[in-house]
């Protein structure tokens, strides 16, 4: 999971692994959890990593964080402009680190899912509009790196729309892993 500091990554991470909102503290190191998710009547094991605030110290996470990744979750706070503006930075870092880890070209890059967090907070004039989010997705799709940006809005506080993005993430990761295995 990638995104700016305080963009809601840890709250989503904790919800998906069964820790309820507000009942946990932020870890001081990277957080990792293994979760089994049902996809097409098949139980799929997922390794989920959270940067746990390390991105506030550097936007250049160690390339080992990206090793053997099959999908990326990009998160931004629906109410914080900088976290939305920095999505390109996070996506570029993800792509460059994957290439550094041995992927041969851009066509082999793992897919990603975009999550807008804190959807429980009412939208205001300073919030990121749906139109801007749709435009960002179209721009990414237009670059030819990815066919479709899967976008979800979630609220960890209310446990809303947490499962659906991870079902999509798991399906994308499984498809990607299978296609990479065929190439190797």
Curated annotation (Swiss-Prot):
Transmembrane annotation, as ranges: none
InterPro entries: P-loop_NTPase, Small_GTP-bd, Small_GTPase
Short sequence motif named Effector region, residue ranges: 25-32
GO terms of biological process kind: phagosome-lysosome fusion
Sorted UniProt keywords: GTP-binding, Nucleotide-binding
GO terms for cellular component: late endosome; lysosome; phagocytic vesicle
Any Pfam family: Ras
Protein's name according to its UniProt entry: Ras-related protein RabN2
């Amino acid at each position: 999971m990638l995104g700016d500091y305080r963009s809601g990554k840890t709250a989503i991470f904790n919800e998906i692994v069964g820790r309820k909102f507000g009942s946990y503290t932020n870890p001081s190191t990277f957080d990792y959890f293994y979760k089994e998710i049902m996809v097409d009547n098949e139980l799929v094991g997922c390794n989920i990593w959270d940067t746990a605030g390390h991105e506030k110290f550097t936007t250049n996470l160690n390339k080992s964080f990206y090793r053997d990744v099959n999908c990326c979750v990009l998160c931004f706070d629906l109410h914080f402009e900088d976290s939305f503006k920095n999505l390109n930075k996070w996506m570029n870092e993800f792509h460059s680190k994957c290439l550094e880890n041995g992927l041969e070209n851009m066509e082999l890059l793992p897919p990603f899912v975009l999550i807008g967090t804190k959807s429980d907070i009412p939208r205001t004039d300073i919030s990121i509009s749906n139109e801007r989010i749709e435009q960002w997705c179209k721009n990414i799709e237009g670059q030819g790196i990815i066919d479709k940006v899967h976008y979800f809005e979630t609220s960890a506080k209310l446990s809303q729309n947490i499962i659906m993005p991870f079902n999509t993430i798991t399906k994308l990761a499984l498809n990607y892993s299978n296609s990479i295995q065929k190439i190797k």
